[in-house]
Protein backbone atom coordinates (compact mmCIF):
# COMPACT_ATOMS: atom_id res chain seq x y z
CA UNK A 1 0.00 0.00 0.00
CA UNK A 2 1.50 3.33 -1.00
CA UNK A 3 1.37 6.55 1.04
CA UNK A 4 -1.58 8.07 -0.78
CA UNK A 5 -3.75 4.96 -0.49
CA UNK A 6 -2.95 4.68 3.23
CA UNK A 7 -3.88 8.33 3.80
CA UNK A 8 -7.15 7.93 1.91
CA UNK A 9 -8.13 4.84 3.92
CA UNK A 10 -7.42 6.73 7.18
CA UNK A 11 -9.56 9.61 5.98
CA UNK A 12 -12.45 7.29 5.07
CA UNK A 13 -12.53 5.86 8.60
CA UNK A 14 -12.63 9.33 10.13
CA UNK A 15 -15.34 10.58 7.80
CA UNK A 16 -17.56 7.57 8.45
CA UNK A 17 -17.36 8.16 12.21
CA UNK A 18 -18.05 11.89 11.85
CA UNK A 19 -21.00 11.29 9.53
CA UNK A 20 -22.53 8.81 12.00
CA UNK A 21 -22.28 11.40 14.77
CA UNK A 22 -23.65 14.15 12.52
CA UNK A 23 -21.10 16.78 13.50
CA UNK A 24 -20.23 19.78 11.36
CA UNK A 25 -16.62 19.16 10.33
CA UNK A 26 -13.59 21.24 9.41
CA UNK A 27 -11.95 19.39 6.51
CA UNK A 28 -8.34 20.21 5.59
CA UNK A 29 -6.62 19.45 2.28
CA UNK A 30 -3.05 20.35 1.44
CA UNK A 31 -0.84 20.36 -1.62
CA UNK A 32 2.82 21.37 -1.80
CA UNK A 33 1.76 24.90 -2.84
CA UNK A 34 -1.59 25.50 -1.15
CA UNK A 35 -3.75 24.73 1.88
CA UNK A 36 -7.54 24.44 1.68
CA UNK A 37 -10.07 24.36 4.53
CA UNK A 38 -13.82 23.75 4.34
CA UNK A 39 -16.52 23.54 6.97
CA UNK A 40 -18.99 20.87 5.84
CA UNK A 41 -22.47 20.26 7.26
CA UNK A 42 -23.19 17.24 9.45
CA UNK A 43 -24.87 15.22 6.72
CA UNK A 44 -22.03 16.00 4.27
CA UNK A 45 -24.25 17.59 1.66
CA UNK A 46 -23.16 21.24 1.74
CA UNK A 47 -20.04 23.31 2.24
CA UNK A 48 -20.92 26.02 4.73
CA UNK A 49 -17.64 27.99 4.79
CA UNK A 50 -14.39 27.73 2.84
CA UNK A 51 -10.97 29.40 2.78
CA UNK A 52 -7.69 28.67 1.03
CA UNK A 53 -4.34 30.14 0.08
CA UNK A 54 -5.57 30.48 -3.52
CA UNK A 55 -7.66 33.53 -2.53
CA UNK A 56 -6.22 36.94 -3.39
CA UNK A 57 -6.48 38.41 0.12
CA UNK A 58 -4.50 35.47 1.57
CA UNK A 59 -1.86 35.69 -1.16
CA UNK A 60 -1.43 39.38 -0.38
CA UNK A 61 -0.74 38.65 3.31
CA UNK A 62 1.94 36.00 2.81
CA UNK A 63 5.06 35.71 0.73
CA UNK A 64 4.70 32.00 -0.09
CA UNK A 65 1.44 30.04 0.08
CA UNK A 66 2.79 26.58 0.92
CA UNK A 67 4.21 27.16 4.40
CA UNK A 68 3.11 27.18 8.05
CA UNK A 69 2.53 30.94 8.19
CA UNK A 70 0.08 30.89 5.28
CA UNK A 71 -1.74 27.90 6.83
CA UNK A 72 -2.15 29.91 10.04
CA UNK A 73 -3.66 32.78 8.05
CA UNK A 74 -6.16 30.36 6.48
CA UNK A 75 -7.03 29.13 9.99
CA UNK A 76 -7.74 32.68 11.15
CA UNK A 77 -9.91 33.39 8.11
CA UNK A 78 -11.92 30.16 8.43
CA UNK A 79 -12.59 30.89 12.13
CA UNK A 80 -13.76 34.43 11.35
CA UNK A 81 -16.06 33.22 8.57
CA UNK A 82 -17.51 30.57 10.89
CA UNK A 83 -18.29 33.26 13.47
CA UNK A 84 -20.13 35.26 10.80
CA UNK A 85 -22.24 32.20 9.91
CA UNK A 86 -22.93 31.39 13.58
CA UNK A 87 -20.82 28.23 13.70
CA UNK A 88 -18.93 27.93 16.97
CA UNK A 89 -18.13 24.22 17.25
CA UNK A 90 -16.80 21.78 14.66
CA UNK A 91 -15.18 18.35 14.52
CA UNK A 92 -11.72 18.25 12.97
CA UNK A 93 -11.24 16.10 9.86
CA UNK A 94 -7.52 16.04 9.08
CA UNK A 95 -8.09 13.94 5.92
CA UNK A 96 -5.55 11.32 7.00
CA UNK A 97 -2.67 13.80 7.32
CA UNK A 98 -0.45 13.84 10.41
CA UNK A 99 -1.30 16.50 12.99
CA UNK A 100 1.94 18.33 12.29
CA UNK A 101 3.24 21.35 10.38
CA UNK A 102 0.71 23.15 8.21
CA UNK A 103 -2.28 21.13 9.42
CA UNK A 104 -1.41 21.84 13.06
CA UNK A 105 -0.81 25.55 12.37
CA UNK A 106 -4.20 25.92 10.67
CA UNK A 107 -6.08 24.26 13.54
CA UNK A 108 -4.25 26.15 16.29
CA UNK A 109 -4.90 29.49 14.57
CA UNK A 110 -8.59 28.61 14.25
CA UNK A 111 -8.69 27.70 17.97
CA UNK A 112 -7.05 31.00 18.93
CA UNK A 113 -9.72 32.88 16.98
CA UNK A 114 -12.59 31.21 18.83
CA UNK A 115 -13.46 28.03 16.94
CA UNK A 116 -14.04 25.08 19.29
CA UNK A 117 -13.12 21.49 18.46
From Swiss-Prot:
SUPFAM superfamilies: Translational machinery components (SSF53137). Keywords: Ribonucleoprotein, Ribosomal protein, RNA-binding, rRNA-binding. Gene3D superfamilies: 3.30.420.100. GO terms for molecular function: 5S rRNA binding; structural constituent of ribosome. GO terms for biological process: translation. InterPro entries: Ribosomal_uL18_bac-type, Ribosomal_uL18_bac/euk. GO terms for cellular component: cytosolic large ribosomal subunit. NCBIfam families: L18_bact. Part of the 50S ribosomal subunit; part of the 5S rRNA/L5/L18/L25 subcomplex. Contacts the 5S and 23S rRNAs. This is one of the proteins that bind and probably mediate the attachment of the 5S RNA into the large ribosomal subunit, where it forms part of the central protuberance. Belongs to the universal ribosomal protein uL18 family. PANTHER family: 39S RIBOSOMAL PROTEIN L18, MITOCHONDRIAL, LARGE RIBOSOMAL SUBUNIT PROTEIN UL18M. This is Large ribosomal subunit protein uL18.
Amino acid sequence: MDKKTARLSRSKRTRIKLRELGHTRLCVYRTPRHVYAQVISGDGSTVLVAASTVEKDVKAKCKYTGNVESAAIVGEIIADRCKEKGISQVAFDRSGYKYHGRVKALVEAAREHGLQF
